[in-house]
Structures are given as structure tokens and as C-alpha cells.
Amino acid sequence: MAIERTLSIIKPDAVAKNVIGQIYARFEAAGLKIVAAKMVHLSRGEAEQFYAVHKERPFFKDLVDFMVSGPVMIQALEGENAIAKNRDLMGATDPKKAEKGTIRADFADSIDANAVHGSDAAETAAVEVAFFFPGMNVYSR
């Protein structure tokens, strides 16, 4: 099995609900290590740049507005099959369709306020981790 890194964002809705610790406990219980983390309030420019892949989609403006509405917790996770493990923990994008016991089923309110973001592939994970943690501030352990 390959050791991978993936990016995870706990979105403003979940930060406001004070469930960061509960989400972190799920990462750790699944064997994922938090190798970098920071709380930030994204600027509009940062959110637009991070989600640029969705720029032409009808939901882009609402997504950016939501992501700048409050602080977010950003972390790089590391472990065997980290990308797939994190996506399994998150559950379906729409919390109404997410399996019971997933982060979105337990903490998300809607398809827009869906608690968490996670990289979807190795290539995007590398880009996303580098976007928020450039240089030497990711620490394997």
C-alpha cells in the first residue's frame, strides 16, 4: 500500500459548530496522520484561486461566498491510501445521500454547507497541499 498525502478542509459551517476535534478523531481512528494544519479566514482571492477549476460552473460564486464566510481549518493528512480513506470518511457531497456515520451525514446541513473538502486524486492532492502548505511546513512522522 502506498503512503499518500491529501488535503482536507473543515469548512466554515463545521468550524462554527465546533466539531473540529470530532473530525480530527475520525482522521486519526482511520490511521491518517495530520502532518500540517492551520486555521485561516480565506480571502476572496484565495478562495477563487483554490476553486478556479470550478470558475465556469453555476455554483462558483456561492461556493466562494461560503468559503469566505468564516474561518476554515486546513490540514494535510498522510497515510496508506489517504485520499480514498478521507473521501470514505467524508461521505457523499450531498449529506442527504451520505452514508450514516460519515462526516457529512453527521455534521453537514446541505450540499453547499457540506462540512468538509477533500482532494479527489493524487494529482489534485499534490497541487492542493502545495497551495496551502508551500515549502517545508509539512512534517511526516
Swiss-Prot record:
Enzyme class: transferase
GO biological process: CTP biosynthetic process; GTP biosynthetic process; UTP biosynthetic process
Any one of the GO CC terms: cytoplasm
Keyword tRNA-binding: no
InterPro entries hit by this protein: NDK-like_dom (IPR034907), NDK-like_dom_sf (IPR036850), Nucleoside_diP_kinase (IPR001564)
Residues at the active site: H117
Catalytic activity: a 2'-deoxyribonucleoside 5'-diphosphate + ATP = a 2'-deoxyribonucleoside 5'-triphosphate + ADP; a ribonucleoside 5'-diphosphate + ATP = a ribonucleoside 5'-triphosphate + ADP
Residues involved in ATP binding: K11, F59, R87, T93, R104, N114
Source domain of life: Bacteria
This enzyme's EC code(s): 2.7.4.6
Required co-factors: Mg(2+)
Alphabetized UniProt keyword annotations: ATP-binding, Cytoplasm, Kinase, Magnesium, Metal-binding, Nucleotide metabolism, Nucleotide-binding, Phosphoprotein, Transferase
Main localization (coarse): cytoplasm
Localization annotation: Cytoplasm
Keyword Nucleotide-binding: yes
GO molecular function terms listed in the Swiss-Prot or TrEMBL record: ATP binding; metal ion binding; nucleoside diphosphate kinase activity
Signal peptide from the UniProt entry: none
NCBIfam families registered for this protein in UniProt: PRK00668.1
Subunit structure: Homotetramer.
HAMAP family for the chain: NDP_kinase
Family the UniProt entry places it in: Belongs to the NDK family.
Protein name in UniProt: Nucleoside diphosphate kinase
UniProt source species: Cupriavidus taiwanensis (strain DSM 17343 / BCRC 17206 / CCUG 44338 / CIP 107171 / LMG 19424 / R1)
